[in-house]
Design a protein with these regions (language model features):
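Generic alpha-helical transmembrane segments
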Residues: 139-150
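Membrane-embedded alpha-helical bundles of multi-pass transporters/translocases
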Residues: 104-111
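Alpha-helical transmembrane segments and their helix-start/interface "positive-inside/aromatic belt" motifs
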Residues: 3-19
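Single conserved hydrophobic/aromatic residue that forms the stacking wall/gate
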Residues: 151-160
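Membrane-interface helix-boundary motifs at transmembrane edges
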Residues: 89-101
């Protein structure tokens, strides 16, 4: 029962931390232009939730916004790892050894690691094609891991 409370609390924090970080970056880059040393990095008059004028990556890749975004993503990745470990313990307590439990843990922690790697390299510019490919592969791996989690996570019918 204690693990269920931990998972509930972690779920809320896994939502709040990135939400606050991305919106803080958006506010900084659209409203506080004097903080940015390179004026071509600022964004004018956009509300990306409506007009799609900026991506999360675009708002978080420049100084000083990456000072907010990167630590928040590291914290989120840590919380995600704890989340999947506690979920594993909950499933072991309820169901015993589920057939996809190890895969679920692998893909959950793998996606958190991909998030960390992506956050580390966000905002770093190299004009090397291998570097650009590496960044895309990391994002693709993150997405694939999340999709695999959908198929490996137990559903309520597995516990009947």
């Amino acid at each position: 029962m204690d693990n269920i409370k931990k998972v509930k609390a972690l779920s809320i924090w896994i939502f709040i931390v990135p939400f606050v970080a991305t919106n803080t970056c958006l506010i900084l880059i659209t409203q506080f232009h004097e903080l940015f040393p390179n004026k071509e990095n600022i964004i004018h008059f956009t509300f990306p939730y409506i007009d799609g004028g900026a991506s999360i990556s675009r708002t978080a890749r420049y100084f000083p916004t990456y000072l907010v975004f990167k630590p928040a993503m590291f914290l989120t990745a840590y919380l995600l790892i704890k989340y999947w470990i506690f979920n594993k313990q909950i499933i072991l307590n309820i169901h015993g050894n589920h057939k996809h439990l190890k895969k679920m843990l692998f893909f959950g922690i793998g996606s958190a690691i991909c998030l960390v790697i992506h956050s580390i390299f966000l905002g770093i510019k190299f004009d090397i094609d291998a570097y650009k490919l590496f960044r895309r592969v990391i994002m693709l791996a993150f997405i694939i891991f999340e999709i695999c989690l959908l198929y490996t996570s137990p559903s309520p019918r597995d516990f009947v």
